[in-house]
A protein has these predicted regions:
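Selective transmembrane-helix segments that form parts of the transport pathway or gating/packing helices
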Residues: 14-20, 104-122, 157, 195-205, ...
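Nucleotide-cofactor and metal-assisted catalytic machinery
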Residues: 315-560
Length: 686
C-alpha cells in the first residue's frame, strides 16, 4: 500500500516539478557522457599522460556533486514545506512518522530513478556529440560508437544516488520531529518577514556594491602582480560581498517605498516592488548562491573559449617546423639530417649556423621594455605612448636567474638562411637594404616595442647596422631561432661573427609514427648547454629537439583536458541555478492566483495582468543574474586583455564573454519561457 502511494506521488511530483525533473535528467545525461571520457579505453591509449583529463574531470565532478547535492536537498526541503499540510493529513489519519518517511523516501528515489534512467538513455546520444567535439579539439578523427560503458554507468549511478541519499539523510531528523501543528504552520513560514533595521540593511548592500568596484579596480591595475594568497583573499571577499548585496537589497527597496519615490505609483510598480522585495528577503541566501553559480558558469565557459582559441592558433605559431634541433657550434647535424631523410625522402631540411658578435644592444632593449621584466627593474611604460626611453647602452641590474630567458649575446642569422626558412614555411622572401638588419620577433611582443626600437643600432663589420624592418611570422623562437627575437643581416657581415650554435629545421610531409619520432630523438646526441627559453608562459618547452606533431598533440590534449571540465561545470551550474529560480516561481502560482483576482477587481484586464506577471518574473530572474553578468563580464574583460597580451591571440573580451553570454541567454530563455507558460497556466486555472 505504501509502495503504491509512493509511486502515485512520484508520478504527481514529476509533473508538479517538471523543471526540476528535466534538470535531473540533463545532469544525469551530462554526467554519464563526461564519465565516458574517464573510462573509455580508446582515449586512454591516445596519450601516455591520459591521467590529466581523468584528474581534471575528477575535480570537476567533485564540484558538480557539491552543487547537485545542494540542489537535491534544497528541492527536498522545498517539497517538504509545500506538502507539509499533506503530511499533517497523514498524521491525522493515523499514520506513523516512520511510514510517512518511507513514503517520501520512496517517491523521491522513484523520481530520481526515472530521471537517472531517462538521462542515461539521452546520455548515450549526448556522448557521441561530446566525443566528436573532444576528438576534434585534440586533432583526431572519431567514429560513432554506441557501445555500452559499464564503468561509466556505475560511476554515474554512484555519484547521482549518493547525492540523493545524502540529501534525504540530511532531512531525516525533520521527519522524526514533525507534528501536526508544526506542519500546518510550515507552508506559511515565508510569509513571516522581519524588516529589521533598514539603514543597516541598506548599508550592507551598498558595502557589497562598493567591493565590486574595488575588486574590478584592483584586478585591472594590479592583476599582474597579485600573488596566490592575494587572489584567494579577493575571491573570498567577492563571494562575501555577493551575499552582503542580497542581505540588504530588500532594505533598499523598503526605503524607496517609504520615501515614496516618483515611480512607485506608476502602473503596477508598487505591486512589483513589494513582490520582489518580499522574495529577496526570504531568499537572500539562495539568491547569493545563485549569483555565485551564474558567475562561475559564465567565467568557466569564457576561460574555456580562451584556452580553445590559444590551442587552435598559438601552438602552431610556436612550432611551425616539423622538426627543430639545436646543437653546439661545432655540430654538423649529419646524423640528424640522415635520419630525417631516411624516414621521409620528401622532407625539406636546412642546417644553418646562428652567430653572435658579443653585443647585447637588442637584448638590453628587450629587458628594459618588456612587461615580463618590469618587476625586475625594467620599465614597461617605455613602449608606445610611454615616457622617455631607458638607456640601451647599459644593462639594468637583474637577478642571475633572469638571464636564462635570453642568450648572453644578440643572436644573428644570415639573410640567405632566413629566406630559406621562410620559403620552407611558405612566406615570401625578405629584402634587406645595405647597412641594415632585420628584427624577427614574436607577434605578441610587437605592441610592447616602442618606436625607439628603430634607434637601436648594432656593431658589425666595423660599422653600425640600423634596423630596417621587423617581421613577426611564426619562427620557433623559444630558444632555437633566438629566444623571443633574432637579428638578420647580410651573409658577408654575419660570417665575420663567431658561431653561437647550430640549428636544423625540417618540414616533413605526412604523419610520423611513434617509432619515427623515437628515431629522430635518438639521432641527436650532441646536446647543447646554451639554450634559452624566451618569455612565453602559457606553453614552454625547453629542449634541444622539438617535434611539432608531438608538441601539438600534447598541447591540445592538455588544454582540452582543462577547458572541457570548465564547460562541464558551467553547464551544470547554469541548469541548477535556473532550476531553483523556476521552481520557486512556479510554486507561488497559488498565491498569485489571489493577487491576480485582486488586480482584476481593480480594473486590470487579463492581458495587462499577464504583462505584469511577465515583468515580475523578469525582475525575479534578473535579480541574481545581473550581478553575475556584471562581475563575470568585468573579470573576463580584464583577464582576456592580459591573456591577449601574454599569448598573442587575436581575440577580445567580446569574443570570449559574448559567446558565453549568448549560450547563457539561450539556456536562460528556455527555462524562463517554460516557467512563464506554466506559471500563467496555473494562475488562471479554474
Amino acid at each position: 500500500m505504501l509502495t503504491k502511494l509512493s509511486l502515485r506521488n512520484a508520478g504527481r511530483t514529476w509533473k508538479d516539478y517538471l523543471v526540476f525533473f528535466v534538470t535531473l535528467v540533463l545532469i544525469a545525461a551530462i554526467m554519464f557522457s563526461f564519465n565516458g571520457l574517464l573510462f573509455d579505453p580508446d582515449i586512454r591509449t591516445l596519450e601516455t599522460d591520459s591521467y590529466i583529463i581523468a584528474v581534471m574531470l575528477g575535480i570537476a565532478t567533485f564540484f558538480i556533486l557539491l552543487v547537485l547535492a545542494w540542489l537535491i536537498q534544497y528541492m527536498i526541503r522545498f517539497m517538504m514545506k509545500k506538502r507539509s499540510r499533506e503530511f499533517a493529513t497523514y498524521l491525522l489519519l493515523g499514520m506513523k512518522r516512520r511510514q510517512i518517511t518511507h513514503i517520501f523516501w520512496g517517491e523521491s528515489l522513484a523520481l530520481g530513478a526515472m530521471a537517472f534512467l531517462l538521462g542515461t538513455i539521452i546520455g548515450l546520444f549526448l556522448r557521441q556529440f561530446l566525443f566528436a567535439c573532444f576528438y576534434t579539439l585534440i586533432g583526431k578523427s572519431y567514429r560513432l560508437d554506441f557501445s555500452w560503458n559499464t564503468p561509466s554507468f556505475l560511476m554515474t549511478l554512484l555519484c547521482f544516488f549518493s547525492c540523493y541519499l545524502l540529501a534525504l539523510l540530511f532531512h531525516q531528523k525533520k521527519f522524526r520531529g514533525m507534528n501536526i501543528a508544526g506542519l500546518v504552520r510550515a507552508d506559511r513560514e515565508n510569509e513571516c518577514i522581519r524588516e529589521g533595521n533598514l539603514i543597516t540593511g541598506a548599508a550592507t548592500s551598498l558595502a557589497g556594491i562598493a567591493y565590486f568596484v574595488i575588486f574590478g579596480t584592483v584586478l585591472y591595475f594590479k592583476g599582474g602582480s597579485l600573488d596566490n594568497d592575494d587572489i584567494i583573499r579577493m575571491i573570498v571577499l567577492l563571494i562575501l560581498s555577493i551575499y552582503l548585496l542580497y542581505w540588504g537589497l530588500a532594505s533598499l527597496f523598503s526605503l524607496y517605498l517609504k520615501k515614496r519615490g516618483k515611480r512607485i505609483y506608476h502602473g503596477t510598480n508598487l505591486f512589483l516592488i513589494r513582490q520582489l522585495s518580499s522574495k529577496i528577503r526570504t531568499m537572500r541566501f539562495t539568491f547569493g548562491t545563485l549569483t555565485v553559480l551564474f558567475t562561475l558558469s559564465l567565467l568557466g565557459c569564457s576561460l574555456a573559449l580562451m584556452l580553445n582559441q590559444y590551442q587552435n592558433t598559438q601552438l602552431i605559431y610556436k612550432y611551425p617546423f616539423s622538426v627543430s634541433i639545436l646543437g653546439n657550434a661545432s655540430s654538423t647535424m649529419e646524423s640528424e639530417q640522415a635520419t630525417i631523410n631516411g624516414l621521409s625522402p620528401d622532407a625539406v631540411t636546412h642546417v644553418y649556423k646562428v652567430y653572435h658578435n658579443g653585443g647585447e644592444q637588442m637584448r638590453t632593449y628587450y629587458l628594459t621594455h618588456l612587461r615580463a621584466f618590469a618587476k625586475y627593474g625594467g620599465n614597461p611604460d617605455n613602449g608606445p605612448g610611454g615616457g622617455a626611453s631607458a638607456s640601451v647602452d647599459s644593462l639594468i641590474s637583474m637577478p642571475d636567474g633572469i638571464w636564462a630567458q635570453y642568450y648572453n649575446h644578440d643572436p644573428f642569422m644570415r639573410l640567405s638562411d632566413y629566406n630559406a626558412l621562410r620559403r620552407m614555411l611558405g612566406f615570401p622572401e625578405a629584402g634587406l637594404p645595405e647597412g641594415g638588419y632585420l628584427l624577427q620577433t614574436k607577434y605578441r611582443l610587437l605592441k610592447e616595442l616602442g618606436d625607439d626600437v628603430y634607434q637601436v643600432t648594432v656593431p658589425a663589420g666595423g660599422s653600425e647596422l640600423y634596423l630596417a624592418g621587423i617581421y613577426t611570422d611564426a619562427f620557433c623562437q623559444d630558444g632555437h631561432n633566438g629566444s623571443d627575437y633574432i637579428l638578420v643581416a647580410d651573409d658577408d657581415v654575419v660570417e665575420q661573427m663567431e658561431v653561437y650554435y647550430t640549428e636544423l629545421a625540417s618540414m616533413i610531409p605526412g604523419t610520423l609514427s611513434d617509432e619515427q619520432i623515437g628515431a629522430i630523438y635518438s639521432s641527436h646526441t650532441d646536446y647543447s648547454d646554451i639554450i634559452a627559453s624566451g618569455t612565453d608562459t602559457m606553453t614552454l618547452t625547453i629542449t634541444d629537439t622539438l617535434i611539432s606533431q608531438e608538441l601539438l598533440a600534447e598541447g591540445k590534449w592538455g588544454y582540452t583536458s582543462i577547458s572541457l571540465p570548465m564547460v562541464y561545470i558551467g553547464l551544470v551550474y547554469l541548469c541548477v541555478a535556473l532550476t531553483i529560480l523556476s521552481v520557486q516561481q512556479l510554486s507561488d502560482s497559488g498565491k498569485y492566483r489571489y493577487h491576480c483576482q485582486l488586480l482584476s477587481s481593480l480594473g486590470l484586464r487579463r492581458k495587462q495582468i499577464n504583462r505584469t506577471l511577465l515583468k515580475q518574473m523578469s525582475w525575479f530572474y534578473l535579480c541574481p543574474i545581473l550581478p553575475a553578468v556584471l562581475i563575470s563580464g568585468m573579470a573576463v574583460i580584464i583577464i582576456s586583455g592580459k591573456f591577449v597580451n601574454a599569448t598573442g591571440v587575436s581575440g577580445s573580451a567580446f569574443t570570449y564573454f559574448g559567446t558565453s553570454f549568448f549560450i547563457f541567454v539561450g539556456i536562460y530563455l528556455l527555462y524562463f519561457i517554460a516557467a512563464y507558460v506554466g506559471f500563467v497556466r496555473d494562475v488562471w486555472k479554474e
